[in-house]
Curated annotation (Swiss-Prot):
Positions of ATP binding: 30-33, 51, 87-91, 415, 495
Record organism: Shewanella denitrificans (strain OS217 / ATCC BAA-1090 / DSM 15013)
Record PANTHER family: 60 KDA HEAT SHOCK PROTEIN, MITOCHONDRIAL
Gene name, Swiss-Prot/TrEMBL: groEL
Protein name per the record: Chaperonin GroEL
Record GO cellular component, one term: cytoplasm
Catalysed reactions listed for this entry: ATP + H2O + a folded polypeptide = ADP + phosphate + an unfolded polypeptide
Family: Belongs to the chaperonin (HSP60) family.
């Protein structure tokens, strides 16, 4: 085991603070509408330009092991805020730095670190409760667009496209962000349920100009097995021929004689039919077939629950207004399932999401829920160059997370105003001793730090701006975008409550641990041994006599 170096007390804290400051100073220049860019060097390709706090934090690794520990702990603050709310990473970093700097000053002055931490924790608990009271519901499209705009660094086009997407697919709907081909941002909305399985045979195509299949008011047969014997399908096909309606078959697979017969019947116009494979694999396929059944008001024909395909009737089939099938996708539009059943299925999937610990499973469950609840929207980000594309895509993703957080827990006045107002409300919090009282003061001071940093980045004197805002009431704050004071909600400067709350909680949690650090242990860097020199050439052998 390599030898370790141990630092104690003030020596340890000074090193840790140096690391905290290096990381926080690099991150905090990005805060606010007039925040600056940070350029990140990449080992291949062009450098990345970003205004995203967590992207900057993730790049930082320091040479000094003790300084690096401080930097990594603040990086954890940014990552946690990003995971919880998807935004607020820079705010969290600024809060953490302020608490650590003031806290370590107090420790150096001889105060008890544990009492300081207790004071900070009490202040944060009280602040979170007040934030929730201050919070307002965010339900209308205008408010959603404003939140998205603020999070995307005052880019109105991003805020509006996200608001439109949410309006189209609902609040539970899936909105994904992709790199587009054009210069402008584009929004593509897929209504109804879409899954990534296309037609099993091109001979089913009835719209040659688009290479797709369109079925109007079709019956939908859902089967959880392979169909290879046409005899199993005959009763259903005979019943269908009488109604004259088209049929979509969704099964594990349709092959051999069964597929050939369906193709021939379709081409002769006897029965209008199309077949696709069921989406997903294993248990997920069973669940997705059940989703389609609930959406279309049908029944999944599965032998494990005692239903045989030969005995299926038209009552077992689902229906929809329209089905569109391409080479890669199947979209079921306006299924005729009962609304109450769809709602309870969505609630069931939501519960599974809460119980799941796997991010992959959660993502798949979220997709299933969205497909049932309303649809899927794809925002295609447009830009002139690859560097701009990466930067813009990161901003769109940030804005999307922020708007989701706003819909979930509501909004508070932006621009750091909410934390300043909350700080004034909890100044008289009860504590047990003077050191705890100072802990509360440290937390209250930190709550001003985001506003001060926004003002500094806008080229203003932070203390003047902070005092002006503190002397105001309610939503009165500083709009750094156009350098004016006024009602933040009226000016459309909103922050999601969840983002502000998460930033404060994670910053206080990790900063509190850093204040109470008394020793640090790190490996002593090994000096790498010099390379061995090449071996000299061997002399030739002398000639033999």
């Amino acid at each position: 085991m390599a030898a370790k170096e141990v630092k104690f007390g003030n020596d340890a804290r000074v090193k840790m603070l140096a690391g905290v400051n290096i990381l926080a100073n690099a991150v905090k220049v990005t805060l606010g509408p007039k925040g600056r860019n940070v350029v990140l060097d990449k080992s291949f390709g062009s450098p990345v330009i970003t205004k995203d706090g967590v992207s900057v934090a993730r790049e930082i690794e320091l040479e000094d092991k003790f300084e690096n520990m401080g930097a990594q702990m603040v990086k954890e603050v940014a990552s946690k805020a990003n995971d919880a709310a998807g935004d607020g990473t820079t705010t969290a970093t600024v809060l953490a730095q302020s608490i650590v700097v003031e806290g370590l000053k107090a420790v150096a002055a001889g105060m008890n670190p544990m009492d300081l931490k207790r004071g900070i924790d009490k202040a944060v608990i009280a602040a979170v409760a007040e934030l929730k009271k201050l919070s307002q519901e965010c339900s209308d499209t205008k408010a959603i667009a404003q939140v998205g705009t603020i999070s995307a660094n005052s880019d109105e086009s991003i805020g509006e496209i996200i608001a439109t997407a949410m309006e189209k697919v609902g609040k539970e709907g899936v909105i994904t962000v992709e790199e587009g081909q054009a210069l402008e941002n584009e929004l593509e909305v897929v209504e109804g349920m879409q899954f990534d399985r296309g037609y099993l045979s091109p001979y089913f195509i009835n719209k040659p100009e688009t290479g797709s299949i369109e079925l109007d008011s079709p019956f939908i047969l859902l089967v959880d097995k392979k169909i290879s014997n046409i005899r199993e399908l005959l009763p259903i096909l005979e019943g269908l021929a009488k109604t004259g309606k088209p049929l979509l078959i969704v099964a594990e697979d349709v092959e051999g004689e069964a597929l050939a017969t369906l193709v021939v019947n379709n081409m002769r116009g006897i029965v209008k039919v199309a077949a696709v494979k069921a989406p997903g694999f294993g248990d997920r396929r069973k669940a997705m077939l059940q989703d389609v059944a609930i959406l279309t008001g049908g029944t999944v024909i599965a032998e494990e629950i005692g239903l045989e395909l030969e005995k299926a009737t038209l009552e077992d089939l689902g229906t929809a207004k329209r089905v569109v099938i391409t080479k890669d996708n199947t979209t079921i539009i306006d299924g005729s399932g009962e609304h109450t059943q769809i709602t309870s299925r969505v609630a069931q999937i939501k519960q599974q999401m809460e119980d799941s610990s796997s991010d992959y499973d959660k993502e798949k469950l979220q997709e299933r829920m969205a497909k049932l609840a309303g649809g899927v929207a794809v925002i295609k980000v447009g830009a002139a160059t690859e560097v701009e594309m990466k930067e813009k895509k990161a901003r769109v993703e940030d804005a999307l997370h922020a708007t989701r957080a706003a819909v979930e827990e509501g909004v508070v006045p932006g621009g750091g105003v909410a934390l300043v107002r909350v700080a004034s409300m909890i100044a008289d919090i009860e504590v047990l001793n003077e050191d705890q009282k100072h802990g509360v003061v440290i937390a209250l001071r930190a709550m001003e730090a985001p506003l001060r940093q926004i003002a500094t980045n806008a080229g203003q004197e932070a203390s003047v701006v902070a005092n002006t805002v503190k002397n105001g009431t309610g939503n009165y704050g500083y709009n750094a975008g156009n350098d004016t004071y006024g009602d933040m909600l009226e000016m459309g400067i909103l922050d999601p409550t969840k983002v502000t709350r998460s930033a404060l909680q994670f910053a206080a949690s990790i900063a509190g641990l850093m204040i109470t650090t008394e020793a640090m242990i790190a490996e002593i860097p090994q000096e790498s041994a010099p390379d061995m020199g090449g071996m000299g050439g061997m002399g030739g052998m002398g000639g033999m006599m």
